[in-house]
Regions:
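Cyclophilin-like peptidyl-prolyl cis-trans isomerases
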Residues: 1-163
C-alpha cells in the first residue's frame, strides 16, 4: 500500500479496502476514523468501543449503493450529533466504489455512510465524498440488505497518516 490512511471493512461477504481522503476532507475522515476506533464520544456506544463493529448494511439498492453505519439498523440512527458537509472540488461521485456520507440534508452528517455501485454525479455537493474503494468492489457489489460489517479496521501507512 502507498502511504495513506485506509479503512478495511471486514464484512460477512469479505474484505473491502478504502483509501480515505484525509487531506481533502479532514473533518469527515477524522469523525469516521474516531468512531471506527472507539475514540469519539457518542450516545450509542461507550468510549473505547468501536462504533461500526457488528452494524448491518441496512439499505442496499442494487446498481446504486450499499449503506451502513446506523446503530438502529433502520436508517434513522446516528451517534447523537451532526456535523457540516465538507465538499472538495476534486472529490466527486464519478465512479463505482465512492465512499460518501449519508445524510438527511445539509449539515446532517453523523455516522451513516454509503459506497456506490456506479457513478452517481447527482449526489455531488449533497453528500461528502471521503474515500474510494481500492480493493473489494466485487464485495461491495455482492452485499445484500442486512449483511453485517463484522469489524472496521483503520490502517495507517507512512508518517503523515500516523500523525
Amino acid at each position: 500500500m502507498k502511504d495513506g490512511l485506509y479503512a478495511k471493512f471486514n464484512t460477512t461477504k469479505g474484505e473491502i479496502i478504502v483509501a480515505l481522503e484525509y487531506k481533502k476532507t479532514p473533518g469527515t475522515v477524522g469523525n469516521f476514523v474516531s468512531l471506527a476506533e472507539g475514540n469519539l464520544e457518542n450516545e450509542i456506544k461507550p468510549q473505547g468501543t468501536p462504533y461500526y463493529n457488528g452494524l448491518k448494511f441496512h439499505r442496499v439498492i442494487p446498481d446504486f449503493m450499499i449503506q451502513g453505519g446506523c446503530p438502529k439498523g433502520t436508517g434513522s440512527g446516528g451517534p447523537g450529533y451532526q456535523f457540516d458537509d465538507e465538499f472538495h472540488p476534486d472529490l466527486k461521485h464519478n465512479a463505482p466504489g465512492i465512499l460518501s456520507m449519508a445524510n438527511a440534508g445539509p449539515g446532517t452528517n453523523g455516522s451513516q455512510f454509503f459506497i456506490t455501485h456506479i457513478a452517481t454525479p447527482w449526489l455531488d455537493n449533497k453528500h461528502t465524498v471521503f474515500g474510494k474503494v481500492i480493493e473489494g468492489q466485487d464485495i461491495v457489489d455482492a452485499i445484500v440488505q442486512n449483511d453485517s460489517l463484522v469489524s472496521l479496521e483503520i490502517i495507517r501507512v507512512g508518517k503523515e497518516a500516523e500523525a
